[in-house]
Amino acid sequence: MPTQASQKRWKQILQSIYDAIEDHGYPPTVREIGKSVGLSSSSTVAAYLEKLLAAGLIAKDPAKPRTLEVTSAGRDFIGVQDHGIPIVGTVAAGVPITAIENIDDYFPVPDDLPYAADELFMLRVQGNSMIKIGILDGDQIIVKKQNDAENGQIVVAMTEEDEATVKRFYKEKNGIRLHPENDSMDDMFFPDVTILGIVVSLYRPALV
């Protein structure tokens, strides 16, 4: 366990990382963390980050830039409670519509999903472009946050027009093809898209 002084600094750094991800959707740089907590030396901040990694309070993918995140243990350390999976709005499954980024509600993490709540978000589907694989209008899809995908995976993607849509993803020689699972609809082609995540589960509200 850290000393009382170190514990205070650990909490400051964890809070800085957590707040940046909550506010901006991505973690801060080492320099930004230092500025936030009053440390001018980047090497000192880096040393603290190594200690937090070793303690399991933060995690990162060494093969990718800016993948720092606060773990469940880290959130417990700073007193942040998990509410569940955030429901962040509506995504198009047909003609794309602008995604709503504010959190509308929270949904409990299903027991059979091997992910933490902070790795996921939910979106409500509008349209019928994915009906062949059982994603229907009004369904709520559970999405694992990640910025890449393999060909054939079902993704939530943001197009160049800043509109979000759920489609089957294919990276091709001349760009990206988003394939609807509906025989009456055509494929969509883009030079590039931003992947928000891959669909890992689905919830269908019960009819009353």
From Swiss-Prot:
Alphabetized UniProt keyword annotations: Autocatalytic cleavage, DNA damage, DNA repair, DNA replication, DNA-binding, Hydrolase, Repressor, SOS response, Transcription, Transcription regulation
DNA-binding region, residues: 30-50
A matching Pfam family: Peptidase_S24
Site (Cleavage): 93-94
Keyword DNA-binding in record: yes
GO function term, MF aspect, one: DNA binding
Gene Ontology process terms (BP): DNA repair; DNA replication; negative regulation of DNA-templated transcription; proteolysis; SOS response
E.C. designation(s): 3.4.21.88
Catalytic activity: Hydrolysis of Ala-|-Gly bond in repressor LexA
The protein's enzyme class: hydrolase
Subunit structure: Homodimer.
HAMAP family for this protein: LexA
Function noted in UniProt: Represses a number of genes involved in the response to DNA damage (SOS response), including recA and lexA. In the presence of single-stranded DNA, RecA interacts with LexA causing an autocatalytic cleavage which disrupts the DNA-binding part of LexA, leading to derepression of the SOS regulon and eventually DNA repair.
Family membership noted in the UniProt record: Belongs to the peptidase S24 family.
Protein name: LexA repressor
Organism: Lacticaseibacillus paracasei (strain ATCC 334 / BCRC 17002 / CCUG 31169 / CIP 107868 / KCTC 3260 / NRRL B-441)
Lineage: Bacteria, Bacillati, Bacillota, Bacilli, Lactobacillales
Gene: lexA
